A protein has these predicted regions:
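N-terminal loops that bind phosphate or other acidic moieties
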Residues: 1-133, 137-379
């Protein structure tokens, strides 16, 4: 029996690799002779770098860069030498996990460090750069990253703008003369799981600003500032992309990557699946098991189980989901290739307990699934 194990990470609990290992351990109890193929997955957010580098036998590199609030951080990024491809997970340099909850500041946080990672990839001769842009602490429209790459932003008095999205309200003009010329020879791809525009009620500031520390007044100010930034970008760049799906991803980094770098926007799970060879692995399999921390209606928006189920469906392979919790609307996934879904806790349990005991719970649930499958096969 050939089983593909392709889960995402369980946030604040286990990495995708840890989830896959626990599921494999449970299946092995019942099917010791089964061919278990572990394909840890991600959707452009947390774990994307790790999943791609591990599956591609790439190199994990480290770079000291400027963090979201100006502090120096050691960020990891991936290098696939054979294809001269760099994997940059922006959360490594500009992520929410780098800022304690009490210090989160959507108004002044910057993506400058992400730009520094791009520059490091250019120094190594990258021909393709994949930007995984989930989990950001920033709301600067990607301005900081572009400044790190040579874009100059000035106010009316010819002073360089300080970091952060709020400062963009004072932008008077953009100078592209110092933009790194190597960028023109690189193919950029954005791997993300959101398709919001830059501005408006569904834009970066309104939807994601509050979780980054913005109050209602600041959300309004940031939205206006990003709109002002987009107005000026439209004057010096060939295309206005503010309303394109994904421009609001990562506090507007999606906008800057599209506008300045010509980046192609792709569903994060699609990019990861391609690089880890999921389609080839699923072909001929008897079962696919995937999962994530919370499985609900939001999964339909390009989350890992959705992407995995679509691939399995194309090959007629059944899919079972194991999730930390089953939320509202998860049943909708039954129309998109999922055959069954199970939550981890077998009884009342706190979130903290479920997270700490996730390996054991995953192993038990996987073993239970295998026993039911085996029993059904005997009939």
């Amino acid at each position: 029996m050939k089983i593909i194990i392709a889960p995402d990470s369980f946030k604040d609990s286990l990495s995708a690799e840890g989830v896959a290992q626990a599921i494999a351990a449970g299946l092995s109890e019942v099917w010791p002779q089964a061919q278990l193929i572990q394909c840890p997955m991600a959707d452009g957010g947390e774990g994307t770098l790790q999943a791609i580098v591990a599956a591609s036998h790439g190199e994990l590199r480290r770079q000291a860069v400027r963090g979201p609030l100006g502090q120096t951080v050691e960020a990891s990024w991936g290098w696939l030498a054979d294809s001269r491809t760099a994997i940059i997970e922006m959360a490594e340099a500009s992520g929410l996990q780098l800022v304690p909850p009490g210090l989160r500041d959507a108004c002044t946080s910057s993506t400058f460090g992400t730009g520094e990672l791009i520059r490091a990839a250019l120094d190594l001769g990258a021909q393709r750069i994949i930007l995984a842009i989930g989990g950001s602490a920033t709301n600067d429209g990607g301005a900081g990253a572009m400044q790190a790459l040579g874009v100059q932003l000035f106010d009316a008095e010819e002073h360089t703008l300080p970091s952060g999205g709020l400062a963009l309200a004072r932008l008077a003009h953009i100078n592209l003369e110092q933009l790194d010329p190597r960028l023109a020879h690189v193919r950029f791809e954005i791997a993300a799981d959101v398709n919001n525009p830059l501005c408006g009620p569904h834009g970066a500031s309104a939807i994601f600003g509050p979780q980054k520390g913005a109050n209602p007044q600041q959300v309004h100010q940031l939205d206006a500032a990003l709109g002002h930034f987009a107005d000026h970008c439209a004057k010096v760049l060939p295309k206005d992309v503010r309303d394109e799906p994904g421009s609001g991803a990562a506090g507007g980094l999606g906008f800057a990557a599209k506008a300045f770098l010509g980046a192609q926007f792709r569903a994060g799970v699609q990019v990861v699946a391609e690089l880890v060879g999921l389609d080839a692995a699923v072909r001929g399999a008897d079962l696919v098991i995937t999962g994530e921390g919370r499985f609900d209606a939001q999964t339909l928006r390009g989350k890992t189980p959705f992407g995995v189920a679509r691939i399995a469906q194309q090959h007629g392979v059944p899919v079972i989901v194991i999730a930390g919790t089953l939320g509202d609307g998860y049943e909708q996934m039954y129309a998109h290739g999922v055959d069954a879904a199970f939550a981890l806790p077998a009884g009342p349990m706190s979130l903290e307990q479920a997270c700490s005991e996730a390996p054991r719970l995953l192993q038990e649930r996987a073993a239970d699934i295998a026993r039911v499958w085996r029993t059904a096969a005997k009939r």
